[in-house]
Regions:
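Sec-dependent signal peptide recognition
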Residues: 1-8
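Surface-exposed loop/turn and secondary-structure junction residues enriched for glycine/proline
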Residues: 4, 68-69, 101
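N-terminal signal peptide c-region/cleavage motif recognized by signal peptidases
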Residues: 13-16
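Short N-proximal segments of mature Sec-exported proteins
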Residues: 19-81
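Short, compact, well-ordered microdomains
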Residues: 81-112
Length: 112
């Protein structure tokens, strides 16, 4: 039920900016180049980081993902990027579901 609710919330939250994993991966590649200091690269990097942050925040509010307070924003962003790099065959799927899939095995909330 929580997964369904999270999917619905993410769909509603991101529907105006819905993107696929391929688009998210492109932004991840720009994120990695941000030190080159071009406006387009910096913008894409910010979109990538913001998208991952927003998705993680949504999953945390719904108690679906529970990263430790010691986990940095950069670690989450890098983990999602690594998942996108290593799984090109799924990048046509919704970006929000790929963020979840990248993090679920590592940061799932413990069941009581």
């Amino acid at each position: 039920m929580k997964i369904l609710l999270a999917s619905l919330l993410i769909f509603i939250s991101f529907s105006s900016n819905a993107m696929t994993g391929n688009e998210l991966y492109e932004k991840f590649n720009e994120y990695k180049k941000v030190n080159q200091n071009t406006i387009d690269i910096a913008f894409a990097a910010g979109m990538y980081a913001g998208y991952v942050d927003g998705a993680v925040d949504t999953f945390q509010v719904l108690d679906i993902l529970c990263p430790s307070s010691l986990v940095t924003r950069g670690q989450l962003i890098d983990t999602v990027g690594k998942f996108l790099e290593n799984n090109p065959e799924v990048r046509h799927k919704a970006a929000s579901s790929l963020v979840y899939n990248a993090l679920k095995d590592i940061f799932s909330c413990k069941k009581e």
